[in-house]
Amino acid sequence: WLHGMPKHYVSRPPKASDGCVVLANQDLLALKKFVDIGSTQVVISERLDFVPIDVWQSHRKAALRMVDTWKKDLEKGFSKGIYHYASDVKIDGQGLIEWQKNQQISNKSFGKISIDDLTVMRYPSDKDMMLVSFKQEDKLSGEIRKQQYWMKVGTRWQIVQEDTSKL
């Protein structure tokens, strides 16, 4: 999370943010003018490597094709969509089998899946990892926001973590 500090704090002890990025309230208010709260991605890295536009476009196109294939397979049924998930995937904090059992979706259909507000980010420190974030709507889940972490395993990209929140 990116957030400000309680009003009565002048500063915060180092490393007391529980993994969050903490800004002075004045700085957070200034930043608010330039970002869309709740949807602007924040990348933290020791170093950023910029790539030529054609390389970026090629990576983005490949990622969009991957997500589209995942979506189309999931529309055909969970047994088709499961192909895109790593065997040790965590979905909303659960392993695949546990999640599938709790959701009772193995024989249910998602129907038509709509995806909007899609963003794709390669991890700065790991070229074989990317974060895909989007809004999803289908008859089984309703309207949700999804974050998928895709990792390249050998020659194949797989979802290694998926987090969902209601909109």
Where are these regions (language model features)?
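Short, well-ordered alpha-helical segments enriched in acidic and aromatic residues
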Residues: 76-92
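A structural boundary/capping signal
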Residues: 52, 74, 115-118
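Stable alpha-helical elements in mature extracytoplasmic
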Residues: 27-31, 66, 70, 82, ...
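Low-complexity, intrinsically disordered terminal/linker segments enriched in charged
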Residues: 153, 161-167
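A mature extracytoplasmic/lumenal domain signature
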Residues: 4-6, 27, 35, 46-48, ...
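Exported/periplasmic cell-wall-interacting domains
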Residues: 1-68
